[in-house]
């Protein structure tokens, strides 16, 4: 059971909350949690209701405490000359000052389990509770109906019929139910422009943007573009993490390093939410991200490649994993 990964304070708080929620969760006053209806619903056509047995994964997000103080701290951390400039907090210190309390975290867990949802993961910073259940269980838990929609371009997605409902005692404790809809999909913004037949002869002429093959950017070009040539640091002794929503092919990275005479930087994949890591349609972006880091910091000791599902919940969990790992 997941309880073994929770601190003792959270376990004790959970026991009390579980009793409270199991007593009369259904009869409790509910409150609408705003911000869960995707704007593209206005241009979408409703198709039908999501099958009752379809599995749904959600990230229950809790609000941070002391947000005014956090905003001030963030400003000072990045203001040269300030006494706090560059003095970043450890994960433990951040949790003590800004994370939700153990009792609030336990309350969200207790609510989820009282509704029949399975808690699939908890996190040390107490900001996210990952849960899963079939569509019918999710609908009952949050007082919504999950429907399927189709956009004019043909893509289909899931969305709730209305804003989720939560018990009044969770107001201020639960900020968002991420994953009710699948409307948002991250994608690259580069577009291929069709070339008419008469222009086919110029299709393979290199665009002289950079000094690399086919006019591509070499490591020197990249440093010039970002005004990094005058910076002596090369990343020696440091590790980097990159946020990704797709996989990549390792040989693409090693070929890049070999062609430009760069060191062979070790890569370590960190797969989030059971993501397979298999390269898909977004693999090119992932490859570019990794190569960019190697180009500007060739002496780094390792790159951690965090890969999660291309979904709202996947984005939340991947960023949160980077923060809590603190590698």
Report the location of each language-model feature.
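Sec/Tat signal peptide C-region and signal peptidase I cleavage site
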Residues: 24-28
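Intrinsically disordered, low-complexity segments
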Residues: 3, 20-22, 209
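N-terminal secretory signal peptides that target proteins for export/translocation
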Residues: 1-9
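Substrate-binding/charge-relay-adjacent region of secreted/lumenal peptidase catalytic domains
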Residues: 29-124, 130, 135-327
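Positively charged, low-complexity intrinsically disordered regions
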Residues: 8-12, 208
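Bacterial N-terminal signal peptides
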Residues: 11-22
């Amino acid at each position: 059971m997941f309880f073994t990964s929770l601190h003792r304070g959270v376990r004790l708080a959970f026991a009390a909350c579980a009793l409270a929620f199991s007593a009369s969760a259904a009869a409790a006053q509910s409150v609408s949690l705003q911000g869960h209806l995707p704007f593209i619903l206005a241009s979408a056509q409703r198709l039908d209701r999501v099958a009752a047995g379809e599995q749904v994964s959600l990230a229950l997000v809790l609000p941070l405490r002391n947000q005014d103080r956090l905003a001030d701290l963030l400003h000072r951390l990045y203001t040269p000359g300030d006494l706090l400039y560059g003095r970043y907090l450890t994960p433990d210190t951040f949790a003590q000052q800004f994370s939700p309390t153990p009792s609030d975290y336990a309350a969200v867990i207790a609510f989820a389990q009282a509704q029949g949802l399975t808690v699939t993961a908890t996190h040390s910073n107490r900001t996210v509770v990952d849960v899963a259940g079939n569509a019918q269980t999710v609908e009952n838990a949050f007082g919504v109906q999950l429907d399927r929609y189709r956009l004019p371009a043909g893509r289909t997605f899931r969305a709730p019929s209305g804003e989720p409902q939560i018990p009044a005692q969770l107001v201020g404790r639960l900020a968002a139910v991420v994953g009710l809809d699948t409307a948002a999909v991250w994608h690259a913004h580069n577009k291929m422009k069709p070339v008419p037949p008469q222009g086919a002869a110029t299709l393979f002429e290199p665009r002289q943007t950079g000094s690399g093959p086919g006019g591509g950017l070499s490591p020197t070009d990249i440093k010039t573009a970002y005004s990094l040539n005058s910076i002596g640091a090369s990343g020696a002794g440091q590790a980097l993490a990159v946020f990704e929503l797709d996989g990549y092919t390792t040989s693409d990275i090693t070929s890049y390093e070999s062609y430009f005479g760069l060191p062979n930087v070790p890569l370590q994949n960190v797969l989030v939410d059971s993501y397979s890591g298999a390269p898909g349609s977004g693999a090119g972006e992932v490859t570019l991200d990794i190569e960019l880091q190697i180009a500007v910091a060739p002496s780094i000791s390792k790159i951690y490649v965090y890969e999660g599902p291309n979904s709202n919940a996947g984005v939340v969990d991947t960023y949160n994993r980077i923060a809590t790992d603190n590698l």
